[in-house]
Amino acid sequence: DELDPGGSFDTSGEASNTKLEGLQHKYPPTVLLLSTNRCAMYCRHCFRKRMVGLSEDELNRRADEAIAYVSEHEEITNVLISGGVALMNPNSVIERYLEGLCAIDHIDLLRFGSRIPVTLPERIYGDEELLELFERYAKRKTLFVVTQFDHPRELTEQAKKEIGRAHV
């Protein structure tokens, strides 16, 4: 599809599951929030390449609508905050999502999709404010950072240490 000019830019069928701009609801208990279009690197296998170039404001201004949608759908028990890479957002945006979603009783699990532990681990271990946010909100809901290491050498000692320190 990628090299065929007639191929689909939406190879995973995301358009049919999009309920709001930046929110996909394919499976009843789960929503995917596309919180940013930024990444620390662009992966060869990425299926969201078509999103590169959208303004950050355009994606981030939808957070309140997304939180309202989740609040109105009690079947949703877990939220995957991704993008792009969710941890490329400023801490204020991350806190906006955490505060809004942690206030919803029927949410049990919040996941952040991020290759930051691989591509920019300093974003975690160099930012005490981010670590404090995770520590504070992990007391209210279960938090995970869902990441992907493509090769064992990508899993550095620093990455292992900081993932544990992040309380997620």
Give the label of every model feature segment:
Residues 15, 27, 58-62, 126:
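Short secondary-structure boundary/capping elements
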Residues 25-59, 112:
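Canonical Radical SAM [4Fe-4S] cluster-binding loop centered on the CxxxCxxC motif
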